[in-house]
Amino acid sequence: MIELFMKQKMFSFKDAFHIYDRDEQETFKVEGRFFSLGDSLQMTDSSGKTLVSIEQKLMSLLPRYEISIGGKTVCEVTKKVTFSKPKFVISGLNWEIDGDLWRDEFQLTDGENVRMSVSKKWLSWGDSYHLQIAYEEDVLICTAIAIVLDMVLYNDEDESIF
């Protein structure tokens, strides 16, 4: 089980997240671009090498984001139309989101196995979240999906769930 802590940078003109390991060492940094049409973020390692790209697809009625690792599209995350709690489709992976997104407690599953659990850390400066990722090979994609969910649900309200 890989444990990461995700903190959204406060007071920034662009989207920015810092991801730390259990020893409080920064593992990844995620930053958006200034003046881009739609959201466009890059996840980098400690040396500044881009590992993941997150691009909002603007030619869509509903929020839709493409996640690429190493230049290859891995999945798309699209918000579905609902009248109650938010729902998302994660195409390309056949994964599902279970739990309560509004209460900041949910799991990402592949139908049988939990791939990631997310919970909000209360009483912290800014928005901080605890990510528990079951498989090492899922660290990048799970972290990117958590960031996309935050952007879709709370970007317009200047709030965050991750």
From Swiss-Prot:
Belongs to the LOR family. It holds the Pfam family LOR. InterPro entries: LOR, LOR_sf, Tubby-like_C. The gene is yxjI. It comes from the Bacteria. It comes from Bacillus subtilis (strain 168). The lineage of its organism: Bacteria, Bacillati, Bacillota, Bacilli, Bacillales. This is Uncharacterized protein YxjI.
